[in-house]
Amino acid sequence: MDAKVVAVLALVLAALCLSDGKPVSLSYRCPCRFFESHVARANVKHLKILNTPNCALQIVARLKNNNRQVCIDPKLKWIQEYLEKALNKRFKM
C-alpha cells in the first residue's frame, strides 16, 4: 500500500474512535415536533417557554381540563401578545 493511503486510513480510524458514536440527531431531539394551533387561552393552566440552542422557539402548555401537556404554535396571536407583554415587563426600566 502507498504511504499516503495508510496515513489517510489511520486518520479516518482515529477520528472514528474519538467520536461519541451517536449522531447529533439521536442524542438530542426537540421536545416539540408538532404544534397545536387550536388552543384557546382560557384552556391554558400554565405556560413553559423552552429555550434550546438546536430548536426553534417552543412553548409547552398544561391544559386546565385534562392536565395534559401540549406544544403550542408560537405563531398564534395570543401567544405573540403574551410574549411581548412578558418581555416588556421583564426588561422595563
Swiss-Prot record:
Feature type site, description Important for dimer formation: H46
Gene: CXCL12
Family listed: Belongs to the intercrine alpha (chemokine CxC) family.
Disulfide topology: C30-C55, C32-C71
N-terminal signal peptide: 1-21
Chain positions of motif Receptor activation motif: 22-23
Domain of life: Eukaryota
Protein name, as recorded: Stromal cell-derived factor 1
GO CC, one annotated term: extracellular space
Localisation per UniProt entry: Secreted
Biological process annotations from GO: axon guidance; cell chemotaxis; chemokine-mediated signaling pathway; defense response; immune response; induction of positive chemotaxis; integrin activation; positive regulation of cell migration
Record keywords: Chemotaxis, Cytokine, Disulfide bond, Growth factor, Secreted, Signal
Native species: Felis catus
Location of the region described as Receptor and heparin binding in the Swiss-Prot/TrEMBL record: 29-33
Sample GO molecular function, one term: growth factor activity
Disulfide bond is among the record's keywords: yes
InterPro entries: Chemokine_b/g/d, Chemokine_IL8-like_dom, CXC_Chemokine_domain, Interleukin_8-like_sf
Binding site for heparin: R41, A42, N43, V44, K45, H46, L47, K48, I49, L50, N51, R62, Q69, K85
Subunit structure: Monomer or homodimer; in equilibrium. Dimer formation is induced by non acidic pH and the presence of multivalent anions, and by binding to CXCR4 or heparin. Monomeric form is required for full chemotactic activity and resistance to ischemia/reperfusion injury, whereas the dimeric form acts as a partial agonist of CXCR4, stimulating Ca2+ mobilization but with no chemotactic activity and instead acts as a selective antagonist that blocks chemotaxis induced by the monomeric form. Interacts with the N-terminus of ACKR3. Interacts with integrin subunit ITGB3 (via the allosteric site (site 2)).
General function of this protein: Chemoattractant active on T-lymphocytes and monocytes but not neutrophils. Activates the C-X-C chemokine receptor CXCR4 to induce a rapid and transient rise in the level of intracellular calcium ions and chemotaxis. Also binds to atypical chemokine receptor ACKR3, which activates the beta-arrestin pathway and acts as a scavenger receptor for SDF-1. Acts as a positive regulator of monocyte migration and a negative regulator of monocyte adhesion via the LYN kinase.
Pfam family, one: IL8
Important for integrin interaction and activation (site feature) positions: K45, K48, K64
Region spans: Receptor binding: 39-41, 48-50, 60-70
